[in-house]
């Protein structure tokens, strides 16, 4: 049974076409992976099917009485809301019924016999509905999911605006799972999640009986949980039955077949044109030449899509720093309360270190304390000599209305326009992306613009806070290669072992230093 039908969908932003005349269907129980490079339109597609965005052309049709739950990579939480309040809001329809039930109870004292009968009938109906939907176990359900995603230890009364990006993602995900929709729409749910909770989500989705559509660049995760792949590329959307690994094999074969057919056809076209040119003027061969020309005119010419630029990251190494890059002396990090025990850490030239641990444990706080961006609660951090620091921040707040070109030019005013465009193109951005405002780009494209700033300046130590979030497969591969080849030192926060294990030579586990209990 089809839950969702999308027919002849066309959409773009200005003169930038996203997809053209695409169709899509979602059947009951299908676990779909929606894949494609950054900027191909995956999140745009999700916004269209959820009604957040109207398409230029086409039809989106949901089955009747289908409840779809959407985890948006750009969703926000309002100040003043608590973790527990957000999670309980998953049950708002039931809570409203409870409120109506309480109103009825208040009205019973003043009701005449006829009103009493009507109110009692309504009261019974509401009580049956609440019992059917396990209303009286709401608190237990909230606690169960909060514990599974590590939210219980943060405190259900905590304001959501005090949370890190990863913690906010967990809150939104927990709320969505508590709603138990007929279909889950998940846009990069593993971004910011640590290994333990990615594993929990993987188990949850494997056991999930209903349908879901999942956008993710986490290939091991995709391979485990999906059974259908929809691939978005060159304004097209193509379906393949199987996991991502199977899709890659089929995609490579189809691409090779198309390229071979293109070469054969180009050879044939060349030979036909040559024959026509040599024989159209001669009376004896004119008819044969006209026949060949007709064949040319009727030929359905194969066109190969223009190759998208693949990112080629390369970090420039500056001057050689001193032996010690930084040393901490009884450093205690945190904001109102300590997040760490007194830390005595040191990093030497040549070290490449992964900083790991659960969300909210203080990894970003430690990085910012080392850089002096936030004050420590006590203790000191002493930076070494001749440091040229490159810092990639996990979250950049606020809307950036500058274009990509302006963004890079502000950072490197001596660059010519050609050099700016070339620098952005090397990061995998097309001309259309380069001329767009940063705020309209996908999360992955925005990350590439920020990486462009980093790779074009001399550094001898990189401090990177979750640089793989939002990046597509090609960009991740290129970034990993660039970090492996980088001659400087690296302190890297990353939740993907398959990324950092081949880059670093040491792992620092924050769980050994935290004051928090998880």
Model-based region annotation:
Residues 313-315:
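Post-kinase regulatory C-tail/linker adjacent to protein kinase catalytic domains
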Residues 250-305:
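Intracellular alpha-helical coupling/juxtamembrane segments of multi-pass membrane proteins
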């Amino acid at each position: 049974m089809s839950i969702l039908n999308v027919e002849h969908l066309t959409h773009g932003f200005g003169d930038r076409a996203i997809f053209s005349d695409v169709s899509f269907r979602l059947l009951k129980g299908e676990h779909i992976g929606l894949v494609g490079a950054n900027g191909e339109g995956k999140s745009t597609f999700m916004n269209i099917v959820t009604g957040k965005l109207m398409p230029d052309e086409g039809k989106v049709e949901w089955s009747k009485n289908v409840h779809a739950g959407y985890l948006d990579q750009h969703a926000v939480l309002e100040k003043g809301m608590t973790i527990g309040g957000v999670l309980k809001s998953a049950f708002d329809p039931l809570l409203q019924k409870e409120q109506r039930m309480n109103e009825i109870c208040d009205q019973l004292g003043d009701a005449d016999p006829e009103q009493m009968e009507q109110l009692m009938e309504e009261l019974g109906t509401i009580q049956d509905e609440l019992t059917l939907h396990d209303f009286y176990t709401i608190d237990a359900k909230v606690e169960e999911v909060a514990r599974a995603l590590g939210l219980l230890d943060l405190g259900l009364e905590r304001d959501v605006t005090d949370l890190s990006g990863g913690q906010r993602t967990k809150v939104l995900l927990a709320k969505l799972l508590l709603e138990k929709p007929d279909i889950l729409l998940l846009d990069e749910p593993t971004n910011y999640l640590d290994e333990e909770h990615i594993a929990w989500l993987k188990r949850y989705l494997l056991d999930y009986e209903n349908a879901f559509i999942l956008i993710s660049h986490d290939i091991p995760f995709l391979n485990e949980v999906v059974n259908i792949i929809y691939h978005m590329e060159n304004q097209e959307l193509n379906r393949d039955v199987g996991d991502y690994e199977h899709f890659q094999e089929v995609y490579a074969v189809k691409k090779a077949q198309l390229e071979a057919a293109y070469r054969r056809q180009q050879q044939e076209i060349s030979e036909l044109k040559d024959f026509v040119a040599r024989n159209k003027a001669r009376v004896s061969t004119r008819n044969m030449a006209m026949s060949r020309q007709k064949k040319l005119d009727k030929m359905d010419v194969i066109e190969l899509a223009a190759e998208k630029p693949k990112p080629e990251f390369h970090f420039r190494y500056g001057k050689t720093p001193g032996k010690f890059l930084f040393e901490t002396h009884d450093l205690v990090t945190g904001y109102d309360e300590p997040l760490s025990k007194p830390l005595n850490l040191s990093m030497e030239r040549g070290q490449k270190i992964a900083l790991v641990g659960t969300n909210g444990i203080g990894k970003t706080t430690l990085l910012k304390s080392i850089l002096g961006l936030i004050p420590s609660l006590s203790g000191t951090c002493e930076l070494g000599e001749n440091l040229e620091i490159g810092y990639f921040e996990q979250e950049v707040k606020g809307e950036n209305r500058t274009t990509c070109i302006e963004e890079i030019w502000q950072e490197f005013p001596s660059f010519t326009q050609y050099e700016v465009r070339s620098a952005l193109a090397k990061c995998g951005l097309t001309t259309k992306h380069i001329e767009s405002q940063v705020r309209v780009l996908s999360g992955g494209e925005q990350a590439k613009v920020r990486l462009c700033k980093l790779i074009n300046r001399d550094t001898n130590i990189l401090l990177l806070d979750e640089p793989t979030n939002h990046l597509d497969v090609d960009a991740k591969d290129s970034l990993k290669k660039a970090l492996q080849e980088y001659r400087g030192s690296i302190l890297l926060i990353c939740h993907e072992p398959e990324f950092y294990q081949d880059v670093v030579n040491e792992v620092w586990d924050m769980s050994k230093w935290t004051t928090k209990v998880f």
